[in-house]
Every structure is written in C-alpha cells, then in structure tokens.
Regions:
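C-terminal domain-tail junction helix/linker
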Residues: 59-63, 84-161
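RNase H-like DDE/DDD metal-dependent nuclease/strand-transfer catalytic core used by mobile genetic elements
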Residues: 2-111
C-alpha cells in the first residue's frame, strides 16, 4: 500500500505511464538492483496500458504485465480505493495552479504513507510495512497491552480487597 511514486499529468499517454514507472523503479532501487524477480505491472485495460509502446518499454525493463479483467475494477481494488481517497481529499478545496494541486497531493501521499493507520494491515502505516518495521511495532504493542492488563488486574485486586 506504500505509494513509492506518483506524477500529476495532464494526459494519460503511454509516456506518462512510463515516466511514472521510471520514478517508481528509481525510488525502489529496482532500476539498479540485480533482482531475481523484477516487479510486474498490474493495470486495467486503458489505452495507455495496452499500447505497443508500453509493451516494448516493459520488455526492455524485463518486467511482466498483468491486466485486470475488463469491467472488473476489483482486480485493482487497492489502487482504486487509494484514488477514491485521494479524490475525496482533493475535492475539498479549489486549486488555481498545478503547483498548488501537486503540493496538496504530495502532502496527502506523505500523510497516507507515514501517518494514516490502515486497519487492513493491522493498524500500521504503509511505511511501517514497506520498510519492514511492522512486526517489531506489533510486538511492542503486544508488550504494552500485556503490561497494561497486568497493571489493571493489580489495581482491580487492590480495589476489591
């Protein structure tokens, strides 16, 4: 769920997709790392995703491409939900310049990645999971919960006696 790259575009051309994918590969380090399994692109069947230009670009990068079933947005459920959440936030204000909109999106992505807890990932932030801190945080929460319960039991026993 961690958003590693995004780009505000005025069109939905294949070049916009490849530039955004380049940003994602650079941010993740996959553009320079020697990995056994390159990332795969999961997309819908929009014109920019079914183009020969994108297929060639993915081939050059040795990346796979999985397309969701037509008229079945649930395949891309996580990113569709993210787009809906972003859209709901963005529509709260008016933006008169693209730079204002970009700044708001950047702030939202930072909040989404680092501050917003997700129930579906054990109330961790996407950054916690992406950077491998999730298990340590969950163990720490469990220790705190155990100590709190012990403290409450002790207080209850003192009060009951």
């Amino acid at each position: 769920r961690y958003i590693i790259a995004w780009k505000l575009c005025t069109t939905m051309k294949t070049s916009d997709v490849t530039e955004t994918l380049d940003l994602a590969l650079q941010a993740s380090g996959c553009d320079q790392a020697h990995v056994v399994h390159k990332p795969r692109l999961l997309s819908d069947n929009g014109s920019s995703y079914v183009s020969g230009e994108l297929a060639e670009w993915l081939g050059d990068k040795k990346m796979g491409h999985v397309r969701g079933a037509p008229y079945h947005p649930q395949t891309q459920g996580k990113i569709e939900r993210w787009h809906q959440t972003l859209k709901n936030r963005i529509l709260l204000e008016n933006y008169f310049f693209p730079a204002d909109l970009e700044a708001q999106i950047e702030a939202f992505v930072d909040h989404y990645n680092h501050q917003r807890y997700h129930e579906s990932i054990n109330n961790l932030t996407p950054a916690d999971v992406y950077f491998g801190r999730g298990q340590a945080i969950l163990k720490q929460r469990e220790r705190i919960k155990r100590k709190t319960m012990e403290s409450r039991r002790l207080q209850y026993r003192k009060h009951a006696a």
